[in-house]
A protein has these predicted regions:
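Mobile active-site "lid"/loop adjacent to the S-adenosyl-L-methionine
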Residues: 111-138
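SAM cofactor-binding core of SAM-dependent methyltransferases
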Residues: 64-101
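Core SAM-dependent methyltransferase catalytic element
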Residues: 175-216
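Short "lid" loop at the C-terminus of a central beta-strand within the Rossmann-like core
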Residues: 72, 118-119, 155-159
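Glycine/Thr-rich phosphate-binding loops of Rossmann-like dinucleotide-binding domains
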Residues: 76-77, 122, 159-160
């Protein structure tokens, strides 16, 4: 599915104004203004803001196997899928460390939604250590080529540019006195070993500006 189609789906399904655009480099950029609806359906600390999952789902209407990483008490009614959390009491599909994901069959998923702790203070609220973002991205390299990772954070995680392409960067703001966050959409690339020789010679997966981002 091309990004022009994804943006059309977003506008059609959400009814929001067109706020995402395809830049000259082929990457999607834009802003989501979430408004002053402070509700988090689960009442769980750090839960997704109202309407976030609906927006993401509208961008990926064809995805059938979603995985919620750092899932907490994610609203599966808004976005069905399996869950991963290190806290067993939350009853996730997989009790696992997001930095290794050893128990998760990542190759069976075509979309991963990640919302890690943003700071040491946030991690303390969850009674966990601060996550190493580059380790999470390394574990996600086991995804099948073409799978997407939707990463909500205040930081762009380090990643390998031969493993992932940045398809979209979306600024997200709720209202005054709230943290400004960024939604980064990664696409898993095929490795050289997975590409036929002809495809390898013609490979155009990497955006021209991708070299501007650091690798893990």
């Amino acid at each position: 599915m091309e990004w022009a189609e994804r943006i059309d789906s977003y506008v059609r399904q959400t009814g929001f104004p067109r706020s995402l655009f395809i830049g000259e480099d082929g990457r999607v950029v834009g802003t989501w203004i979430m408004g002053n609806d402070y509700r988090v359906k689960s009442a769980y600390y750090g839960g997704y803001p109202a309407g976030y999952l609906r927006r993401v789902r509208a961008l990926f209407p064809e995805k059938r196997r979603a995985l919620h990483l750092f899932s907490g008490k994610v609203d599966l009614g808004a976005f069905p899928g399996d869950t991963v959390d290190i806290n067993r009491s939350l009853e996730p599909t997989y009790v696992d460390d997001a930095q290794t994901l050893e128990r998760v069959p990542l190759e069976t998923y075509d979309l991963v939604l990640a919302d890690p702790p943003y700071s040491v203070e946030d991690a303390d609220r969850y009674q966990t250590t601060m996550v190493k973002r580059n380790s999470v991205m390394r574990a996600l390299q086991r995804l099948t080529p073409g799978a997407h990772v939707v990463w909500l954070d205040q930081v762009l995680p380090m990643y390998r540019k031969d493993a992932f392409a940045v398809d979209a960067v979306i600024g997200m703001v709720k209202s005054t006195n709230h943290r400004f966050r960024v939604v980064t959409v990664f696409r898993r690339l095929a490795t050289s070993a997975e590409l036929p020789a002809k495809k390898l010679a013609q490979r155009t997966d990497e955006h021209p500006l991708q070299a501007a981002f650091k690798t893990a």
